[in-house]
Amino acid sequence: MRLLLLLAFISVIPVSVQLLDARQFLIYNEDHKRCVDALSAISVQTATCNPEAESQKFRWVSDSQIMSVAFKLCLGVPSKTDWASVTLYACDSKSEYQKWECKNDTLFGIKGTELYFNYGNRQEKNIKLYKGSGLWSRWKVYGTTDDLCSRGYEAMYSLLGNANGAVCAFPFKFENKWYADCTSAGRSDGWLWCGTTTDYDKDKLFGFCPLHFEGSERLWNKDPLTGILYQINSKSALTWHQARASCKQQNADLLSVTEIHEQMYLTGLTSSLSSGLWIGLNSLSVRSGWQWAGGSPFRYLNWLPGSPSSEPGKSCVSLNPGKNAKWENLECVQKLGYICKKGNNTLNPFIIPSASDVPTGCPNQWWPYAGHCYRIHREEKKIQKYALQACRKEGGDLASIHSIEEFDFIFSQLGYEPNDELWIGLNDIKIQMYFEWSDGTPVTFTKWLPGEPSHENNRQEDCVVMKGKDGYWADRACEQPLGYICKMVSQSHAVVPEGADKGCRKGWKRHGFYCYLIGSTLSTFTDANHTCTNEKAYLTTVEDRYEQAFLTSLVGLRPEKYFWTGLSDVQNKGTFRWTVDEQVQFTHWNADMPGRKAGCVAMKTGVAGGLWDVLSCEEKAKFVCKHWAEGVTRPPEPTTTPEPKCPENWGTTSKTSMCFKLYAKGKHEKKTWFESRDFCKAIGGELASIKSKDEQQVIWRLITSSGSYHELFWLGLTYGSPSEGFTWSDGSPVSYENWAYGEPNNYQNVEYCGELKGDPGMSWNDINCEHLNNWICQIQKGKTLLPEPTPAPQDNPPVTADGWVIYKDYQYYFSKEKETMDNARAFCKKNFGDLATIKSESEKKFLWKYINKNGGQSPYFIGMLISMDKKFIWMDGSKVDFVAWATGEPNFANDDENCVTMYTNSGFWNDINCGYPNNFICQRHNSSINATAMPTTPTTPGGCKEGWHLYKNKCFKIFGFANEEKKSWQDARQACKGLKGNLVSIENAQEQAFVTYHMRDSTFNAWTGLNDINAEHMFLWTAGQGVHYTNWGKGYPGGRRSSLSYEDADCVVVIGGNSREAGTWMDDTCDSKQGYICQTQTDPSLPVSPTTTPKDGFVTYGKSSYSLMKLKLPWHEAETYCKDHTSLLASILDPYSNAFAWMKMHPFNVPIWIALNSNLTNNEYTWTDRWRVRYTNWGADEPKLKSACVYMDVDGYWRTSYCNESFYFLCKKSDEIPATEPPQLPGKCPESEQTAWIPFYGHCYYFESSFTRSWGQASLECLRMGASLVSIETAAESSFLSYRVEPLKSKTNFWIGMFRNVEGKWLWLNDNPVSFVNWKTGDPSGERNDCVVLASSSGLWNNIHCSSYKGFICKMPKIIDPVTTHSSITTKADQRKMDPQPKGSSKAAGVVTVVLLIVIGAGVAAYFFYKKRHALHIPQEATFENTLYFNSNLSPGTSDTKDLMGNIEQNEHAII
């Protein structure tokens, strides 16, 4: 079946738009020299690698799922067990069996296990899960040395649509076809789109793809003056980093605003909007100030009053249309819309000279660079105005700086000193908040200090200085007397013959104590190193910021892309070292570097000039050699001085200059990364930076000594600005790494800080900076430790007398108990509040931090609801103008998640079924605590539409009495919703009785709204009510299914039909066709239909009438009273009558006598109206009394009491005559220690429920016992069998002797004519389902595959004792009925013939497929013979076998 389903799934996948795909790769095993090949959905093997073969192409479609490009299905396994087969499945992001991860040394396996993707063991052709981690479990991307995660998943963020910019889900289903890429299907305009859930047909959520397609220019607004394109994504809800990723997917970037005209244009463009939009401005770098993503200069300021806030973590900026398009800084993890920008950034084109057009010729004391001359005036300090005049007198101007290379030249070669503070030409004197160069050149580059430009305290800080150890910029009051830098155009364009710098050979450049040479050939890292060695030099090292600046100015403007440095981790992966024996004192990594990359380090040119990338050492690039200049006196070795001490309880080693201390805090005292950094700074230190294994071992010793195993600690590691990789917050080099495997992964684009796990591996992980952790501080040896800061007041908010926490104008209650949403809200309202409404990031952050520190791990309900049309509303009716959804949320899972919770670990929100018990947050205004509680609004009475049944304030209708009404669970729910209702939620025993009462005439089970689709074993009502009442049938949930796993049974039915468990619940597969029950609220506009009672007081139900007698009598007097009123004391023969009786007595809340009694029938409980006891509903520990009368208690269960007690009682009238049992015919059943035969009429029956068999095996088991599989010839026999198997329903269903022959005729195995049938509705069905089972729960028949494993029923005639008298005459026909047939007879041979051919006719291929499903029952080496004969304890004798096989040959023509 699985094969057919998957092939059907594949057949509907159309050709969709194929992206030019670096995402695709081949999975390669180096030892086998073979690639994974998906031959079919159930066969994943290997083959000779062929990059053109679609069947060998795979790609990641989520962070942990790999999809076959050919089949659009995902790699998965049926179970997390050794030797499970890896095959292809419909992609399911929630399935644990489809989640893969890369492990150390190219191992690849199921996530969270030590089971690896393996090929070649045990000569198995298919890929398997295997515990071994040898070479056959190691996989790479074909053609590379990289593991499979190097081609990891990149989320594609959708545009417009109705999914709030959610990530495209691949593959997704549209009109029952599957798409693995963006498509234009269904659109006349050709626009490419994607579903944002896997099933668009169900969820209807979509967005357009961030790709170029015909008409995609309409997604952009073009400024007619500049030609720049802008895209306003106001409907999206993404974090800052996600928004930037979305822009970059369109070859754009987040908005940068460099001109006043641009801001005015955007103000008009966004004027109709009100909520904030992300722009590219940020202060993510720990070393520099405000900057635009993408590198545009930050020269125009448009801050909202009060912004930028200095609050830690508010590092990203939004443009707020509702506040005149002003800017404000927020936490980067907030989810907002955003603006993308594409095109030139300036109206004034300006060409920065390249290294090839650099003229020379400058006056004395001036330094040449790229066509200009520069000079620092340090001693003669002037205010900015006079410094400008002085530069102009010399023929120049205050320096303008237009690139990182020019900046680094000034910083490194002009004699800049760390304590300098020098005027440059940037200022906003002419136009406030709009910086310009005094020489009139365009502003193309800025390099601000942290927190700059500030216009601090609203002072007129209109001029700019270059200051500090890094030479970054700050705005200052122009009247301060400072030094200054002048710049002028080169005086001469004549090329001066190049001479040798002092102490260097010709062609080498001098800087400080060293000479440098740019290599002339493209070389690998090794060849470049050899070349430098031959020049008596070495590949360059970089000791500090100044040397880096010199090298940037040396190579940054050159046309080559990379230049090798001497840094690599080839000796020890993860630890970067220079080729010479020098300590790594400085690093300058590019974005995403070094990450998990291993290799050699090269310096980049161009826009990212000077930044370092890790490349394959075999790549070819130019290089820079370095050696000591001649005549330089090398600095002496440092003299040994006594090592400074560390503060008490701090750890260190002689190999580091730092002291370290752990701050392992309780839950209430953990901090965010920013708070931890500020704490460490306050005591004179910094968050720890780990630069070697020695320092890591120091921290490990601290962990072991304090017992802080497995705790998580903040490090100073942070992913800074978009142009940088991970950096240490103290500015030290990132030369040593110890990332956990697969990290850093920036999961969901919100992980920008580093933590260390306190286990022996000491591995690092990137995580959301707002997470609460312990932390590790470091301090320089010998430095004085400052006092620890006192906690801020807001860390310990005041609390009211009744336990509510006060924050601003509101009070909050944080529950410790879990409740459904309805109960939680009732509690809040009882205490003059409601579930919390969250209106701002600060409020969200306060609540999140409080529950993180003080609450449990479970989420908390807040006061948001999601309507059926997926709109958001606050319960108090206030406007939704702030949201904080977690990534991928709301996902409307199962279309029944209408409530919202806040995650404890992140503060983000998730949609959830309202009936799922959670903690909750109540909110009330400070002024509400003295208020009077609002009166409860009475329920408005109303009626139901025709055909619906009224019970209290609900209307019910049962569908399924007509076969065409039956539906799958999802279709049934949609049908109910179409009737303005939902599938029924049964909230108490009274409602259950009402439903059972109305299902009396059903022959079907009926869907309810209960399901565990979203979370296995967590059953919830789809309408969102709490699950406070259940009525599971015996063995449910999780009763056995024929050829179905328990996990497949996710939806719940009320059992109907003539089962003794009618009215109880059973979980079943959601796609099976069943009846269903809809529920709606009453309609106040409809009248309530009055109920009438007949004059005689008897109400008809079914074929009987009942009357509740409201007077208390002893049992015997009650019986007499009923007889005097032409009725009898009521017998209750099935669950329906029980529900009816309980509903009649429930309003009076008193017990009632019923007709069950044991004191009149020799202590056997029987119905006094002579009906057979086939149904009981005993209460716990009943029946207690041996001789007693029985009453129905107020809870509907039956209990025993002495008959002289006085109760109400139920009388019953009925024209039905109790069925009499057929007389037992003479004879007896076989006696055996192994088998227990049960007599009925003229036959004996054996019920086998403990050992299941296929139909063929069951047939021969019966034959071995001298019987045959049961034939059912009368309704009485059917009732007898149903009664006997019903108690066994939780064990198995039972084979009977009916089969379908090749002509399609149904026959009994013993050749009896088919004169009676009892098919389940919808059966018989299926071309290959040729054998019949009797369902234990209902007694009905259904046909299934003959190789399924079931219990079975054998039948044989009673054995007649021999008699010596001649008075009894027996006919031949009677003799045939009563005499058991000998095993070697032709009848037995005929049976065996049928059995053999039925099994063959059932299909060998399908048999072996089912053998796999039932591996626990079927021997591994099953053959045709031993499957049929040799599973039993006894095998046929030789003579029997000979006779049987001979008869098979003789009778073969009769069957085929």
UniProtKB/Swiss-Prot annotation:
Keywords tagged on the record: Calcium, Cell membrane, Disulfide bond, Endocytosis, Endosome, Glycoprotein, Lectin, Membrane, Receptor, Repeat, Signal, Transmembrane, Transmembrane helix
Tissue: Detected in macrophages.
Glycosylation sites: N104, N344, N529, N926, N930, N1159, N1204
Domain Ricin B-type lectin residues, every copy: 22-142
Cytoplasmic compartment spans: 1410-1456
S-S bridge residues: C35-C49, C74-C91, C102-C149, C168-C194, C182-C209, C247-C340, C316-C332, C391-C486, C463-C478, C532-C625, C600-C617, C680-C777, C753-C769, C828-C922, C899-C914, C976-C1078, C1051-C1070, C1122-C1211, C1189-C1203, C1262-C1354, C1331-C1346
Subcellular location: Endosome membrane; Cell membrane
Signal peptide span: 1-19
SUPFAM superfamilies the record matches: C-type lectin-like, Kringle-like, Ricin B-like lectins
UniProt cross-references to PANTHER family, sorted A to Z: MANNOSE, PHOSPHOLIPASE, LECTIN RECEPTOR RELATED (PTHR22803)
Protein name, entry field: Macrophage mannose receptor 1
